[in-house]
Amino acid sequence: MLRDKNKVLSDKIMVLGVDGLDPRLTRKYIDEGKMPNFKKLAEMGAQRHDLVMLGSQPTVTPPQWTTLACGANPCVHGITQFSRTIPGKIDQCGYNVDSRILTAEPMWNGFTEAGYKTLVMHWPGGAWPPTNDSENLFVIDGSAPGSVGSAAMQCDTEQLIGASVDIPEATFIVRDLVNAVAPCVITKLPDQELEASDTAKGMQMMTGLDSEKTSQLQDMGIETINVIYKDEQGFGTRVGDFQQNMSTAISPIKEAHGWASAPADAKEFTLLLCKGLIRRVGLILKNEQGIYDTVAVYKSKKDTTPLVTCPVGKMQYNVIDEVIDNDKTYIANRHYKLMSIKPDGSELKLHLSAAMDTQCDTVLHPKRLAKALMENVGPFPPQSQMYTQDIDMQQSMIEVWDYVMDWYTKTF
């Protein structure tokens, strides 16, 4: 690409990729007017009318994106899957979304060598770590799919907190989906099972099933409520009619007492975070009409200023707090949303997004990008991977991803 010899339409170009986008459905929805933004992008750029591209095998994220970057098949560029075998260690797999495995040249190296400033942002195939030391190259992550920083910066999982006057004590339940497609549910462990009646009461507000219906289903051998089993090897859980990729905590709701500053009619509950290693406290507050519709979360009852105040139905973004992961403390940001609350304050559901380390710069090149992004755009945004049919949870997930897209836009 020589500027003095080739006539070009623009000195700036953007290559935009969307993982898993079906070209047939996209073309159909563009033509039907259902994807106006994609239509604008198509009108501004270049692509086949049917949007079909020549892919490669296997049809999974890392090799496909690397093929797009290098113009070579996986058998040539070397990134063939999410993981790879390690010579001499047949019982171990290595992470494969790693540019150091590349045996082909990605396009951005060619751009930088031709004198063009190039930003590679969240390209999950051959982008990280940088394979070019040019001062024209800027890289923001690319170490994993999901969203920017999802592998390197996430220091706590998403969490659903349920509180009710019917719950006897605060309990933390580690997430049931980690790297599996289906949850690991451990059943029939002797003498270490919660009482089914307590579980039914405590989780009724999450499942939408009353205790009688829940008991009937349990008698049929169908696990539809949260049942916790704990042994020396860990936890297995299931919550409601959806399987979750997040942790869960439940808490009793009581009359507020012992606070430095709390209204006389306030109620309180406990937030167990980070596998129960961090405890926060919440006040349930009335509005002017005497209806409970707001939650305020504090570090402790001694504090007079809350970490966050959550009116029902409104996402609160970038709440900064401590997070503990693997015995290390991080200063992290996450979002809070009070999804529902009963008018009498007897029951509530609170969603917390994953937490992101605000001081991590390990997947940015050059590292000064971390400070520039933090000051001009904001903390790296959490992502959401809730696979659920619950409408409230779906809406919360959409709001989390909308914020991710806003962050991307501001970054550009």
Spans of features found by a protein language model:
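A short acidic-Thr-Gly-centered motif at the start of a beta-strand
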Residues: 1-9
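Short, structured active-site-proximal loop/turn typified by the sulfatase FGly-forming signature C/S-X-P-X-R
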Residues: 26-75, 117-119
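Beta-strand elements within well-structured catalytic alpha/beta cores of enzymes
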Residues: 8-27, 41, 68, 111, ...
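His/Asp/Glu-rich, glycine-adjacent segments
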Residues: 73-411
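A short acidic (Asp/Glu
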Residues: 25-29, 130-133
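Extracytoplasmic/secreted proteins, especially bacterial periplasmic and envelope-associated proteins
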Residues: 25, 33-37, 63, 106, ...
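Generic signal for short, ordered secondary-structure residues
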Residues: 5, 17-21, 47, 89-90, ...
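Short, mixed-charge, low-aromatic patches
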Residues: 22-24, 62-67, 355-362
